[in-house]
Amino acid sequence: MMREERLLKVILAPHVSEKSTNTAENNNTVVFKVAVDATKTEIKAAVEKLFEVEVKNVRTVNVKGKTKRTGSRFGKRSDWKKAYVALNEGADIDFSGGAE
């Protein structure tokens, strides 16, 4: 069993984009921005504990940071990890937080 402290550090934020909205509506899948060193097992445990839902499976993607230019200097944004969390039938996570 993982420590609760670690589970709280695994999920950083929900990832909201056009693609993630479509997958949420069509495939009952939620997309999260997660810690780079997080494993699929940790992500599954964290989502089940924090949102009290049943997780079907977890798929992860390492996203490479973009190269950006400011004047004559080049820099690079940090790499990050994205997790597609498929929920069981009937399970739902509401991020609107009661907004009407």
UniProtKB/Swiss-Prot annotation:
GO terms for molecular function: rRNA binding; structural constituent of ribosome. GO terms for biological process: translation. Pfam families: Ribosomal_L23. It comes from the Bacteria. Keywords: Ribonucleoprotein, Ribosomal protein, RNA-binding, rRNA-binding. One of its GO terms (cellular component) is ribonucleoprotein complex. InterPro entries: Nucleotide-bd_a/b_plait_sf, Ribosomal_uL23-like, Ribosomal_uL23/eL15/eS24_sf. Gene3D superfamilies: 3.30.70.330. The keyword Cell cycle does not apply. One of the early assembly proteins it binds 23S rRNA. One of the proteins that surrounds the polypeptide exit tunnel on the outside of the ribosome. Forms the main docking site for trigger factor binding to the ribosome. Belongs to the universal ribosomal protein uL23 family. Part of the 50S ribosomal subunit. Contacts protein L29, and trigger factor when it is bound to the ribosome. This is Large ribosomal subunit protein uL23. It comes from Idiomarina loihiensis (strain ATCC BAA-735 / DSM 15497 / L2-TR). The gene is rplW.
